[in-house]
């Protein structure tokens, strides 16, 4: 299988998002990379499902709470930016203060 560097990055992010999702389901608190991966993965999948940038920006703030992540993680993540493929092209989705 031949993948472009961008496709490899997306695959790595998706894999990290799955790991984070499973750890969260087991009741573990997520660390910084896991929290970013989970939110980013959900945003990419939402774009694939046909949601708008505005919907994804709004939903991105509701995916995790401070109780679901390790201490200090919400303060470390001020912005998450994900480049997503939409039916009308590639767009950058920015989520400000994603964990409240």
Curated annotation (Swiss-Prot):
Pathway: Nitrogen metabolism; urea degradation; CO(2) and NH(3) from urea (urease route): step 1/1. It comes from the Bacteria. The keyword Hydrolase applies. It catalyses: urea + 2 H2O + H(+) = hydrogencarbonate + 2 NH4(+). Keywords: Cytoplasm, Hydrolase, Plasmid. Induction: The probable operon is induced by urea. Its main location: cytoplasm. It is found in: Cytoplasm. GO terms for cellular component: cytoplasm. GO terms for molecular function: nickel cation binding; urease activity. Its EC number is 3.5.1.5. It is an enzyme of class 3 (hydrolase). GO terms for biological process: urea catabolic process. Heterotrimer of UreA (gamma), UreB (beta) and UreC (alpha) subunits. Three heterotrimers associate to form the active enzyme. Belongs to the urease gamma subunit family. This is Urease subunit gamma. The lineage of its organism: Bacteria, Pseudomonadati, Pseudomonadota, Gammaproteobacteria, Enterobacterales. The gene is ureA.
